[in-house]
Amino acid sequence: MNGKTIILANPRGFCAGVDRAISIVERALEEFGAPIYVRHEVVHNKFVVDNLREKGAVFIEDLAEVPPGATLIYSAHGVSKAVQQEAAERGFRVFDATCPLVTKVHKEVARLDAQDCEIIMIGHKGHVEVEGTMGQLAPGKMLLVETVGDVAKLEVRNPDKLAYVSQTTLSVDETKDIIAALNARFPNIRNPHKEDICYATTNRQTAVKELAEQCDIVIVVGSPNSSNSNRLREVAAGIGTDAYMVDNASYLQRAWFEGKNKVGVTAGASAPEVLVQEVLATIRRWGHETVREGEGAEESIVFVLPKELRREGETKPDLCKR
């Protein structure tokens, strides 16, 4: 034993929303056969998407690419009202793989709009979840802020009829700063009934923060277009620890580990455990012999499939409590 240790973050990897979204595509392929069309990558992970593509899933961005009467699945990130309307007009058989926690934000937007509140969204411009959430209302009806600096530039109709919602995969710490700035500038702004950042994002960021405090280097398994995976790397780096994000083990560089005794490994919510194990095997070959699991929050949430795709024993409620 050389004292070189790998610590695995807990929790890590797939969350309930990702599990559900992947299962919807797989079950639809089993029930209806290929091809099954999916608007956008069902989750942001190359390995997962490539695997589903091999099984017969076709990933598209424009509904014009989908033939009449075909089966269409919305990605876990959600879609706008305009996309839903177009899908209905084209007569597709639709299954909605939107994460229920994203759907919760969509419902909050509808409720606030019905109360004539102007809504601010905290999120990253261009991210598919942000496009879907802001697309719950007509273009221009919601305001987007990405940074604390954006808050000072906001022009609102009525500061007393104002509310905010958040993208579910943001940095917990950075979002707190933006929320503080919003509350400072608009004292009467309405906060969500419950934090929009999802339990899995929060738990994984807490775990990687603890990991970074113990380790000399942190490896995050996740694809470059995965928001929550990028945030994990940023959180670890923010502690002052060397942090790298890799899509799979082939992206690892041996030089990163020179002089590093403790290596932390985690994975974004859309990264499968098989990729973590491949990363682990590579690092072990390079001399880190001891592996141990870190401690963290236990997760037992399960989101069930749409009723049309459920099998015997797969019943409501949608949310099984932790």
Curated annotation (Swiss-Prot):
Q: Where are the active-site residues found?
A: E129
Q: Which family does it belong to?
A: Belongs to the IspH family.
Q: What is this protein called?
A: 4-hydroxy-3-methylbut-2-enyl diphosphate reductase
Q: Name one GO biological process term.
A: isopentenyl diphosphate biosynthetic process, methylerythritol 4-phosphate pathway
Query: What is the required cofactor set for this protein?
Result: [4Fe-4S] cluster
* Organism of origin: Neisseria meningitidis serogroup C (strain 053442)
In which residues is isopentenyl diphosphate bound?
Answer: H44, H77, H127, S226, S227, N228, S270
The residues that hold [4Fe-4S] cluster are C15, C99, C198
Its function, per the record, reads: Catalyzes the conversion of 1-hydroxy-2-methyl-2-(E)-butenyl 4-diphosphate (HMBPP) into a mixture of isopentenyl diphosphate (IPP) and dimethylallyl diphosphate (DMAPP). Acts in the terminal step of the DOXP/MEP pathway for isoprenoid precursor biosynthesis.
Report which gene this protein is encoded by. ispH
Reported EC number(s) for this entry are 1.17.7.4
Q: Name the reaction it catalyses.
A: isopentenyl diphosphate + 2 oxidized [2Fe-2S]-[ferredoxin] + H2O = (2E)-4-hydroxy-3-methylbut-2-enyl diphosphate + 2 reduced [2Fe-2S]-[ferredoxin] + 2 H(+); dimethylallyl diphosphate + 2 oxidized [2Fe-2S]-[ferredoxin] + H2O = (2E)-4-hydroxy-3-methylbut-2-enyl diphosphate + 2 reduced [2Fe-2S]-[ferredoxin] + 2 H(+)
Positions of (2E)-4-hydroxy-3-methylbut-2-enyl diphosphate binding: H44, H77, H127, T168, S226, S227, N228, S270
Q: How is the cofactor bound?
A: Binds 1 [4Fe-4S] cluster per subunit.
Question: So, what pathway does this thing act in?
Answer: Isoprenoid biosynthesis; dimethylallyl diphosphate biosynthesis; dimethylallyl diphosphate from (2E)-4-hydroxy-3-methylbutenyl diphosphate: step 1/1; Isoprenoid biosynthesis; isopentenyl diphosphate biosynthesis via DXP pathway; isopentenyl diphosphate from 1-deoxy-D-xylulose 5-phosphate: step 6/6
Recorded superkingdom: Bacteria
Molecular function per GO:
4 iron, 4 sulfur cluster binding; 4-hydroxy-3-methylbut-2-enyl diphosphate reductase activity; metal ion binding
Q: Where does dimethylallyl diphosphate bind?
A: H44, H77, H127, S226, S227, N228, S270
Q: Which UniProt keywords apply?
A: 4Fe-4S, Iron, Iron-sulfur, Isoprene biosynthesis, Metal-binding, Oxidoreductase
- CDD domains xrefs: lytB_ispH
